[in-house]
């Protein structure tokens, strides 16, 4: 394993990444937890945006934990919403793990790709070590591309809730090479809710570091 510890003012000089992939699908995960994902072609059919910046880390994928009692929220990964205490990320062949403890809430986020299927798994484990009851929520965010560049495809991406599975589906019928492909985002929890409205989540001029939702 390759282990990286980061904190406020203590980060890697440039993004360090782990590539997790099978022959048809993959994702690139950085030490900050930000990532982009593709299917079949890492350039022509990006599911989420790729930031070509050797210094600054950017992403269209994010997770958040929120204390519903206090309103305090943070990410189980160093970005986009860094918590107050250090993060430890462990990277191996086929997986990356992010460990963090914030205000008595310990979390582990495991990221890996199926050996054969075009599926990325993000497994979030949370333990309450604060010694008192805590009402918590977890939120995942994905910014669809379904093409090579988001500015070119954003007007053509359509999202919907699949009535059978309850998953969030996304498609881009204007991508001629992959028009029949459907991307999905799902959560293994019957109490889940979804929104396909980016502005509703981020707010006007909002950012992943401080979303409105």
Segments predicted by a language model, with ranges:
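Anionic coordination/interaction segments
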Residues: 1-213
């Amino acid at each position: 394993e390759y282990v990286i510890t980061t904190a406020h003012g203590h980060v890697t000089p440039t993004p360090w990444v782990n590539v997790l992939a099978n022959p048809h699908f993959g994702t690139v995960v950085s030490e900050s937890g930000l990532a982009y994902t593709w299917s079949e072609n890492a350039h022509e059919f990006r599911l989420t945006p790729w930031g070509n910046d050797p210094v600054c880390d950017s992403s269209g994928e994010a997770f958040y934990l929120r204390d519903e009692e206090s309103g305090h929220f943070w990410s189980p990964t160093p970005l986009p919403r860094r918590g107050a205490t250090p993060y430890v990320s462990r990277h191996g062949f086929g997986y990356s793990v992010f460990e963090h403890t914030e205000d008595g809430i310990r979390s582990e986020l495991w990221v890996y790709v199926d050996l054969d299927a075009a599926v990325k798994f993000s497994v979030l484990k949370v333990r309450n070590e604060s010694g008192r009851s805590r009402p918590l929520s977890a939120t995942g965010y994905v910014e669809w591309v379904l093409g090579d560049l988001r500015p070119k495809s954003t007007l053509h991406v359509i999202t919907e809730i699949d009535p059978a599975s309850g998953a969030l589906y996304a498609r881009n019928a204007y991508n001629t090479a992959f028009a029949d492909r459907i991307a999905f985002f799902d959560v293994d929890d019957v109490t889940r809710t979804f929104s396909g409205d980016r502005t509703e989540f981020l707010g006007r001029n909002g950012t992943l570091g401080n979303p409105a939702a």
